[in-house]
Structure formats: structure tokens, C-alpha cells
């Protein structure tokens, strides 16, 4: 597996990441954990150490599958990237970010997230709620 340094973080991530948006799901539109967890673990066993998910993937159950899959591994060597929706002013409020972060951490059953990304960020929301002093990320 080829690994590259992720930006200025110093973390070496696999050039091939595992996107967890299309994991097997049941008729209830929830992740099929019995199928998904072994698939994720097989990817990790083959050298993939970067897993991408998001708050809304498969009705939020993608993060649960990722969390269960990574439990069997050294967490310092498997990197999880997830996304929080911030497409409107309501989503960009600090208390909403905190609420969603708490949900994500619970779903992943992890004390931390390696990489968090803005999902659906508009320029209006960025300038109004994120880039200003004392903003959501301040």
C-alpha cells in the first residue's frame, strides 16, 4: 500500500481510502453491521488506514459501522474522517456543532475524530458563522 502525508499533520494515510457511504444496508435503510464491519476490517487488514464517513451517511449508521470495525485495531494507526453538515445558519451555530460532534463520537464509540470536514458549506455560512472572531470554530 502506498502512504502519503496528510497535509501538515504528519500522519501517513493510505493513498486508497475507504469511503463508507455505500456500505451494505438492509431494507430499513440502516447499515447491515454483520456485512459492513467485516468489509471495513478487510480493508484495514489490506493496509487501508483512512476511512471516510459522514454524519448523514446511511441515516447516520455508517459511523456506527466504522466505529465497530476500528475497535479491533490500534486507534492511533487507523484514521477516521467524518463530516458535519453546515449548509445553513442553523447548522453552523456553535451549540449545533457541539451537539452533532457528541452524536458522532457516540456513534464511533471513540474519544476523538482524526479529521473533521465541513459538508455543504456555503460562502454565506462560512463568512457569517465560521470565519468571524468568536465563531463556531473559535
Language model regions located:
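Non-cysteine beta-strand/loop elements that form the S-adenosyl-L-methionine
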Residues: 15, 19, 81, 110, ...
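N-terminal binding-site loop/beta-alpha segment at the start of enzyme catalytic domains
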Residues: 1-78
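Generic beta-strand or strand-like secondary-structure segments
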Residues: 65-68, 83, 96-103
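Generic structural signal for helix capping and beta-alpha/helix-loop junctions
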Residues: 25, 60, 87-88, 125
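Glycine/proline-rich, positively charged
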Residues: 89-138
Amino acid at each position: 500500500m502506498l502512504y502519503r502525508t496528510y497535509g501538515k499533520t504528519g500522519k501517513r494515510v493510505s493513498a486508497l481510502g475507504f469511503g463508507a457511504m455505500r456500505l451494505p444496508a438492509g431494507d430499513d435503510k440502516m447499515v447491515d453491521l454483520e456485512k459492513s464491519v467485516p468489509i471495513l476490517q478487510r480493508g484495514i487488514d489490506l493496509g487501508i488506514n483512512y476511512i471516510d464517513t459522514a454524519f448523514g451517511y446511511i441515516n447516520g449508521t455508517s459511523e456506527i459501522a466504522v466505529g465497530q470495525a476500528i475497535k479491533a485495531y490500534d486507534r492511533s494507526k487507523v484514521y477516521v474522517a467524518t463530516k458535519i453538515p453546515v449548509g445553513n445558519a442553523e447548522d453552523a451555530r456553535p451549540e449545533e456543532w457541539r451537539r452533532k460532534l457528541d452524536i458522532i463520537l457516540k456513534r464511533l464509540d471513540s474519544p476523538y475524530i482524526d479529521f473533521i470536514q465541513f459538508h455543504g458549506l456555503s460562502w454565506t455560512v462560512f463568512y457569517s458563522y465560521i470565519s468571524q472572531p468568536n465563531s463556531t470554530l473559535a
